[in-house]
């Protein structure tokens, strides 16, 4: 169970880092938002899901 928690936290950190870099780039590009809207929403949905997964796994471990 601890390995699953550690992998979920690692995935959350990686996803957060990717979103911190990619979202400003999407907004800065002239046509980026209309072309990459689905990618940003998918990344945000993944991030929210990982936050809930980490919270659930944390409550099971503690």
Curated annotation (Swiss-Prot):
Pfam families: Ycf9. GO terms for cellular component: chloroplast thylakoid membrane; photosystem II reaction center; plastid. Coiled coil: none annotated. SUPFAM superfamilies: PsbZ-like. Gene3D superfamilies: Photosystem II PsbZ, reaction centre. The keyword Thylakoid applies. GO terms for biological process: photosynthesis; photosystem II stabilization. Its main location: plastid. The chain crosses the membrane at residues 8-28, 41-61. May control the interaction of photosystem II (PSII) cores with the light-harvesting antenna, regulates electron flow through the 2 photosystem reaction centers. PSII is a light-driven water plastoquinone oxidoreductase, using light energy to abstract electrons from H(2)O, generating a proton gradient subsequently used for ATP formation. Belongs to the PsbZ family. This is Photosystem II reaction center protein Z.
């Amino acid at each position: 169970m601890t390995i699953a928690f550690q992998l979920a936290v690692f995935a959350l950190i990686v996803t957060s880092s990717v979103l911190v870099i990619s979202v400003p780039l999407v907004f800065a590009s002239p046509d980026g938002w209309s072309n990459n809207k689905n990618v940003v929403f998918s990344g945000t949905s993944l991030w929210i899901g990982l936050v809930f997964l980490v919270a659930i796994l944390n409550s099971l471990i503690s």
